[in-house]
Amino acid sequence: MLTYQVKQGDTLNSIAADFRISTAALLQANPSLQAGLTAGQSIVIPGLPDPYTIPYHIAVSIGAKTLTLSLNNRVMKTYPIAVGKILTQTPTGEFYIINRQRNPGGPFGAYWLSLSKQHYGIHGTNNPASIGKAVSKGCIRMHNKDVIELASIVPNGTRVTINR
């Protein structure tokens, strides 16, 4: 199971929202949470595998506007991406793919991979000319063919590291 380290400012509700699970499910998996959260505390996120058992890793470089997929610490492929604009920057840190949806509609293109930060994901686009630019509302945009390929390879629980 995925273990999450509580950060300063996290609440039970914010963690549940980020991982798209109920607070009841979090409490059931972590009875000690009845006493409250403490920064640095490790909690189990039910329904997701231990990400360190998954051989894939995604590294996003905001500055280079690239997404690099690795298998067992060896680069498989690097994709061009679009990232958040100045007022809606792409968040940095370590996240996990927690769910996915094919053909989500609207500007999200052919696929949506939800990250463990509410409202953020890796997705396709209905505007391929935007790839390589800082134009999104914080999400990571890919060409549709690329996000379909990525989604066919990586399972839920895959670690996604985003750096400036």
UniProtKB/Swiss-Prot annotation:
CDD domains associated with the record: LysM, YkuD_like
GO cellular component: spore wall
PROSITE patterns documented for this protein: LD_TPASE, LYSM
Pfam families: LysM, YkuD
Keywords from the UniProt entry: Cell shape, Cell wall biogenesis/degradation, Glycosyltransferase, Hydrolase, Peptidoglycan synthesis, Sporulation, Transferase
Top class in the EC scheme: transferase
Predominant cellular place of this UniProt entry's protein: other
Miscellaneous comment in the UniProt entry for this protein: Regulated by SigK. Could also be negatively regulated by GerE. Transcribed by SigK RNA polymerase.
Oligomeric form and interacting partners: Monomer.
Similarity annotation: Belongs to the YkuD family.
Domain characteristics, as noted in the entry: LysM domains are thought to be involved in peptidoglycan binding.
The protein, known as: Putative L,D-transpeptidase YkuD
Species: Bacillus subtilis (strain 168)
